[in-house]
Amino acid sequence: MTTEHLNHRHWHQSGTYEVWYVTWNHPGTDQGFWLRYLSEAPVDPASRAKPASLHSGGPPRGELWFARFDPRDSRRTFGIHKHFAPPTDREGPFALGIGDAQLGHDHAVGELAGGGHDVRWDLRWVPATQAIRHLPDVTYTKYGNLGVTSVLSPNPRVPLSGSVTIDGETLTFDRAVAGQTHVYGKRHATKWTWGRCADFAGAPGAVLEIIGVHQHRGVQLPRMLWLALDLDGEQHRMTQFRHIVKNRWQGSGTRVEFSAWSPTVRIEGEMSCRPEDMLVAPYLDPDGTEIFCSNTEIGDAHVRVFRRAGLAWREQRVLVGTKRAHFELGGRVRDPAITREHQLVE
């Protein structure tokens, strides 16, 4: 079964954004990478209902974002992004073009220079046969969209091969573990967390993905978390509205804690890193609202899986992913402890 159609472009109208991103690590050095292809279509100023003090989004555009995270020398951690003309896209097969860079369902090729860095990537992967849908099923229908952002992973855990050249240094990849996700929406959540780990020690094939949001719609709504875990041939999906009641998340600084529940399985975990292992990515919503996203691709994940035994819970597995947790915390306020910024270049 193919998941290619899940990468097809969802939006073309103004007031929307759409992102396709890939995250992965280099097995030999533990370096982490974050590659984003972005379509941004700001709100038409004539229809803007919010105060003029908001940032102007400008005309529709494409953007390329690249970040390298180095756990051995944080001075080598950096991120750069650049604006381009609006993306070109097609279906059958899916293809997205931004500048000279290309993204397909099974490959990413491109280059980006600026801020003292020169980056080139030529990457291929074997597409997944099953996707992860992070949100309740109804939200992916035209009647159930939450009205903020939708997210799914057409390629949640795939073997990636190819090369990345950064400032003249080339790293090669031979079936490294990677994940590719597709996000589309009209605005970011008031606060959110995203996290994934697909390279746990002693758990081949396992992949964990979480999405947590804290929305403000006139009043502050309760925190919501959705969690998906593939482990030992089983798929655990705590992603429906019935799970929200007992699912929990809490995050600040460089740490996220979470728990999720079904009648037979309970999952508890955390992802963490050092402040110097994060970058602040400055986003603009289509309406001009500033958003700040603190991201790392070299965090640590620690997850405990419990199975119900009668009235009690028994620990079944402990999963550890050292320097393999990819996670972020986002919101309207920048975290002052994260000092390194993802830089816009000309």
Label the model's feature ranges.
Residues 1-346:
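Structured soluble/peripheral alpha/beta segments that form catalytic or ligand/cofactor-binding pockets
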